[in-house]
Regions:
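The feature marks the mature, well-folded catalytic cores of soluble enzymes
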Residues: 1-366
Length: 366
């Protein structure tokens, strides 16, 4: 793979208990960080097509992963990225002999079927863990279960997953623990039959989304989660749902769909956070779900700054993202690093190793 994605620089620090002295700072790295196997597989597949260099255009259906450094790299090599909000435009712009690349998150089933019916050169980089979610949802949809999916409603993985349930079962998306608790309250209500109406009324307030409420099955439920959610919260959501549903004598089938790589990164990040560093940098794309959850985890321990890449840091200011406000702001480097001696760096599974190394080099120079 391209040197952008290599781990060589960071391996210098790995035999030193994940701590390196960088200038005036002690930099703490987790046991596990950087690209997961699914991301590496997706990037290799796309790189292999580029290396063929046979003159055919390459169209990527949305970002390959949610990291701007990675996507910009592929754009520089001539890959055409179709905007996630307008994937159907592929049919207007791509010739039939073009390479059409399905990203790691997957795409909605109807769109995939149309693309496979029109194009011959399709490169599917969908993560195998995501496909496991699809298999579970497809099976439970055939059983007419009410599908509960714990995840970010607008995320492409979630949209691809719920499309596997087709239109013959009710699908409910819960974005967070508060939504799960509220939904549990509705399930506990004696007026359960009115849930299909209630859920639509509160969606805008609680962030809950409901599809096909006319097929709501109050006796059989199936629970899955987006593969990059916080593992600890996923367990809590299952506990909340199971307690309520089984108390009523109904059925809940649950599938642990948080991928192992995500779980390991969260576990390693938690171990670093418990050391209570003076400061924590979270590094990754602003749209990255697994990076966002590392941010949420780290907030409980130390001051946290969410950085897109190494360009976010210079001698005068640090650009960082506030997820709660969906806003990038600037802070004085001098003020942020005042009285700081230890800095933990946590990176999402879609963050290149070289970006982490560049941040360490930036800190050395400050």
């Amino acid at each position: 793979m391209n040197k952008l994605f290599e781990k060589t620089h960071i391996t210098l620090f790995e035999n030193n208990n994940k701590t390196v002295h960088s200038g005036r700072f002690n930099i703490i790295l987790p046991d596990v960080f950087g690209f997961c196997g699914g991301v590496i597989s997706a990037l290799k597949k796309l790189e292999n097509i580029i290396k063929l260099n046979d003159g055919r255009k390459i169209y990527l259906l949305g970002e390959i992963i949610h990291n701007p450094t990675v996507n910009q790299y592929f754009i520089s090599l001539g890959v055409n990225i179709v905007p996630e909000f307008n994937l159907d435009s592929i049919f207007k712009i791509a010739e039939e002999d073009s390479y059409v690349v399905i990203p790691a998150f997957g795409i909605p089933l109807d769109l995939e079927n149309k693309i496979r019916g029109r194009y011959k050169n399709i490169i599917d980089t969908t993560c195998k863990n995501v496909k496991s979610v699809w298999d579970f949802i497809s099976l439970e949809a055939k059983n007419k279960s009410t599908i509960i999916l714990y995840g970010k409603p607008g995320h492409p993985e979630v949209q691809a997953s719920i499309s596997r349930a087709k239109n013959d079962c009710c699908i409910i998306i819960l974005p967070d623990l508060k939504a799960a608790e509220y939904f549990s309250t509705l399930l506990s209500s004696k007026e359960l039959k009115s849930l299909k109406h209630s859920i639509n009324n509160i969606s805008s307030d609680k962030g809950i989304q409901c599809y096909n409420s006319q097929h709501f099955n109050q006796k059989r439920f199936a629970l899955a989660s987006q593969t990059t959610m916080l593992y600890s919260e996923t367990l809590k959501v299952e506990k909340i749902a199971r307690s309520t549903i089984e108390k009523k004598g109904h059925i809940l089938s649950a599938c642990n769909t948080v991928c192992r790589a995500t779980h390991l990164r969260q576990k390693a990040a938690h171990a670093v956070c418990k050391q209570i560093p003076d400061l924590i940098f979270i590094v990754g794309g602003y749209e990255s779900s697994n990076t966002l959850h590392l941010y949420k985890l780290a907030q409980k321990y130390s001051p946290v700054y969410y950085l897109k890449d190494a360009e976010a840091i210079d001698s005068s200011e640090i650009k960082h993202f506030i997820p709660e406000e969906s806003n990038e702001i600037q802070a004085s480097t001098k003020q942020v690093l005042k009285n700081v001696s230890s800095i933990a760096i946590l990176a999402g599974a879609s963050c290149p190793f070289t970006v982490i190394n560049e941040i360490i080099e930036k800190l050395k120079a400050i």
